Design a protein with these regions (language model features):
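Generic structural marker for isolated residues within well-ordered, non-membrane alpha-helices
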Residues: 14, 59-60
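General nucleic-acid-binding
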Residues: 1-16, 107, 111
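Short, basic interhelical loop/turn and adjoining N-cap
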Residues: 60-77
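DNA major-groove recognition helix of helix-turn-helix
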Residues: 77-85
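Generic structural signal for hydrophobic core residues of well-folded globular domains
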Residues: 40-45, 66, 81-82
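Short, amphipathic alpha-helical "recognition" segments used to contact nucleic acids or chromatin
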Residues: 30-57
Length: 113
């Protein structure tokens, strides 16, 4: 995907799927943020999950949505995401479910094929 303006919509959907997204303690949860970051990186910058650089503009948008003061917070947080995904089956199952739900919504809206 290339259209970064869709990321806030994806976050809204993510919140709907996860539930209770407006609560500060939920938004502040590291696992909550990591899973969202993983999904966005998988959609917009999959090479970042294999050690590459995050596509231009993605960090800034994620930082704004997730309440970071600087985009470097995103880089610091996503370091463990791939490890957790590969090593913890419950973590992986959560992400797989969330990713599938979001992709289905993107397809329904005609944003991807």
């Amino acid at each position: 995907m290339l259209d970064l303006s869709i990321i806030p919509t994806i976050f809204k959907w993510y919140c709907e799927i996860v539930g209770n997204c407006g609560l500060p303690e939920r938004r502040a949860g590291s696992s909550f943020r990591q899973k969202f970051i993983f999904i966005i990186l998988f959609l917009y910058s999959p090479s970042a999950l294999a050690g590459g650089k995050i596509a231009r503009g993605v960090r800034d948008i994620l930082a704004g949505i997730l309440g970071f003061k600087a985009p470097t917070g995103i880089s610091n947080l996503y370091v463990n995401v791939t490890f957790n995904y590969n090593n913890y089956k419950d973590y992986r199952a959560d992400i797989d479910y969330l990713y599938t739900e979001i992709v289905n919504r993107l397809k329904f809206k005609g944003l991807i094929n």
